Amino acid sequence: MITVETIRERHSVREYDGKPLARAEFDALGAVVEEFARESGLGIQLVGDNPEVFNVIARFGLIRGCRTHVAFVVDGGKARCVAADEAIGYWGQKIVLAAQDMGFNTCWCALCSRKKSRAVVAPGKKIRLIIAVGHGKTQGFPRKTKSVETLSSVECAKALAWFAAAMEAAQLAPTAMNNQNFKITLLSDAKTVRIDAPQSGLNVIDEGIVRCNFEIAANEAGADWRWERDI
């Protein structure tokens, strides 16, 4: 079961053991991916034994020793779909946390060789990004984050305990280049929550990831709350 503790334990991992997932592991994770694909309506696929997708030339951000990934397949037009990006972040983070619960390590990867993925990509479609999945050489490490005060604001009389707990989870959400370009506001009714983020680049995917973490913690705290705008 995905909990706030799952969020705390999960860290990005870039170095893996170089081994493919065992068949039972792959099938179990594949069932989770298929379930979330059905619920979300997104094109999500688990792809095994495909290390070539991580072969890129870059000075940083490389994934080593990973053979399995989750691919997000979207419409192939040049125009970026904001709604799809936000959903990719939200549902992708659900997969990341479910994988953590199952004993896997993960890393969000915008930097990859998309054309080398063995995902099934129909004409007119493309891979938006992937998530590396496997057994890491380490469990990853905590990264530096912005303060909760920087990432949030409160318009009601006082901050509530559930909001503080949810903001801690949001603070731990992985974002591109660790930029954390978002702000979450508890509105004056002490129930409605607004999230603001730039609508460019990978920021909208990041917004979806943050939403997922915040939602898990707020619901675990038993809060009576709602988003100002649903996905």
Task: Annotate each predicted stretch with a short phrase.
Residues M1-I231:
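Acidic, surface-exposed loops and disordered segments
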